[in-house]
Amino acid sequence: WTYVPRFNRNVLMISQGGQQWFDTAYYSGVAATAWSWNVRFLDADLDGDDDMLVTNGFAFDTMDMDASLRIKSAQQSGSKDARALYEMKKLQPRYNSPNMLFRNEGRLRFTDVGEEFGFAHDGITYGLGVADFDNDGDLDLVTNNLNESPSLYRNTSQEPRIQVRLPGGVGSKVRLVGQGGTTTREIVSGGGYLSSDSGEVVFAAGVAGQSEMLVVEWRDGTKPTRIERPVVNSIYTVIKPSLARLLVRGEVTKTTPMFRELPDAISFRHFPNLAKDFDENPLLFKRFSTAAPAMLCRDFDNNGRLDFGFQLARSAGVQVFLNLDGDNFRSVTSRYNDPSGLMGNAGWLDGFAVIEGKPNFVGALNKTIPAIESLTQPAALTLRGDMDGDGTADAIYITQNTLNDHPAESRAMVFLNQSGSFRRAVDWEQSLGALGQVTSAVLVDMDEDGDTDLLVSRDLGAIGLYHNRGDRFVDVSEAFGMLEFVGLWQGLAVGDFDNDGRVDFAAGNLGRNSPMELYPDGLVHLGRGGKSRLSLYAIKRGSVHLPVDDMDLYANVVDRARLPAMYRQFSDIDLAKVLDSFDGLRRTRLNCFETSVFLNRGGKFERRALPYPAQFSPTSGINVADFDNDGREDLLLSQNLYSLRPDWGRLDSSAGMILLGQGDGRFEPVRAGVSGLAILGDSRNALVVDFNRDGRTDIVATQTFGQTQVYLGQAGKP
């Protein structure tokens, strides 16, 4: 079943170098600006950063659902001639909306200061032109308002500036080189709705220290014009030199990217077992039937090279790709299916899955655990580690949350290895209890006492830590300061990110570039599993839970008689008056959406959000490796989410994110044009390993509905 995403919002496309552009509108705070027509970037306050101006309004509020119902009723009962249709159109109210000016706060964040700056006319504004009408060196504005006089806005900023005019210079670039860096602007013409600008560019001259040079790079290749030591608060008109002075362009120096793709090296494409998720519950945040494929890495044919295996959908077996020479792979499909779910991601430090390869791997890829072969509920995760300290690998089997029981709790089943025979350990299971909606888990010695502890990430919850006491687990999440961060946590990966000898971990989350950013006061999830399951979000204001979604969506999951007759009334309704058994719903207030690292401070964890480019897209999987061979641990984030509700579109502003560790708990993001990664699909997990044995870490990344991508490491010296 296919649900087509819709994009009823603004986008802000940020260049990543090369041919990649990512949308950050939610993160930047500009996704919703009413009915908008024109957008301009200019440095309104002359602080060195471009601000954003938006004109708004429309003659008819076509989104007024109450008016649409009145029109529909009139169409069914009245005349359909042109005059009658015009009169019906007048049933839609005028949509006056204030214009908006967003101040650039840095790091791609914007704040609406239209009222403060005097650009908040409440009406219907279509055209927007920019020019220096009073010749004072800054840029002024003119707008065209429907059924009103135009508006003229004078820029009253007193900050120092330098203006440059290039007659006939459309497409040329002007650079101001200063002590603090270089600012670049391009001469553009048109591009606005019913509007054009005069073509001047203005630089803030008091930000980067003394201005050292103006450089004009002409569009047609004419040799650049340079002006040494430009005078502040001056207007420069630069005439293009003779075409005889053409610049002969040399070769562009290209740096070697960190990774090189091997196209079609592994021809595995994942197609999950789809269900009618949104037909079952149209209020779901995302689909649950688009799970990522399980993957593993082992030397299946004992030739000394690491091979790869992927679980096929619908229990069709496992597809194995044999590593022939480090660059080429051969596909072999096993008929083995995985009823016990043992192809879940393993929580080992090396990131390998739990399947144990055998020389005769076709049809026998796994040493199953007999005690759980008969279980019918699929596993989200199967972990292996020595929990009871007897030197043998035990197993934890964690049930997954499915569409039919969301948002029910995950449960763990513990199996102790006793001389090769697995015994179910009920005492261990009872010590864990209900685990929440587990999305990832790791067995690792977090408290350095020599045994394996359990770390879990949760959807609609906080990260949990359970210490191993030798005969049971003890929940120490609150003591370690982890319960205060409630989010949509996904993948986990462990390492020592600050080189203090303690185990730290990284956790994936929704990020800060999603529809959740439209609700700065935060959202509350209301959920109930079982036969009367329900999952929805609400805005909490005092004791009232206000709806986030359209009334029509609620009509699919609650009694229509409980809903008001008018859509406008529904926007202010308390959901407690709509939902059956409201008191039985679990309420979860979300307060943390940032993908983060947690640094172990000995008895406490310090959370640090990863740098802001890592928050542009949801992170489902995380890998730890030294990608640049500098001796410090780096991160690979598997990102993007295509399975949101159709009216919320897709979250796909990542090509796979590399973050280079600095050895002190900090990470520096690598732009896609530098990393060489182009994992543009819905990527949930990856394997990182040196499979061509050149001393550099390579990447194999899966994509839901997409081609598996293979990248060879090229960074640093082996």
Label for each model-derived stretch:
Residues 7-22, 65-69, 96-111, 149-159, ...:
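Beta-propeller blade repeat segments, especially FG-GAP/WD-type strand-to-loop junctions
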Residues 37-46, 126-134, 291-302, 322, ...:
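Beta-propeller blade termini
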Residues 47-55, 135-144, 302-312, 356-364, ...:
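Acidic/hydrophobic-patterned starts of short beta strands in beta-sheet-rich repeat architectures
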Residues 58, 147, 314, 365-367, ...:
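Residue-level signature of beta-propeller blades and closely related beta-rich strand-turn architectures
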Residues 91-100, 104-294, 371, 422, ...:
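Gly/Ser/Thr/Pro-enriched helix-cap/hinge segments flanking short amphipathic alpha-helices
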Residues 330-354:
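Blade-loop segments of beta-propeller domains
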Residues 384, 393-415, 419-444, 457-459:
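Solenoidal tandem-repeat scaffolds enriched in leucines and small polar residues
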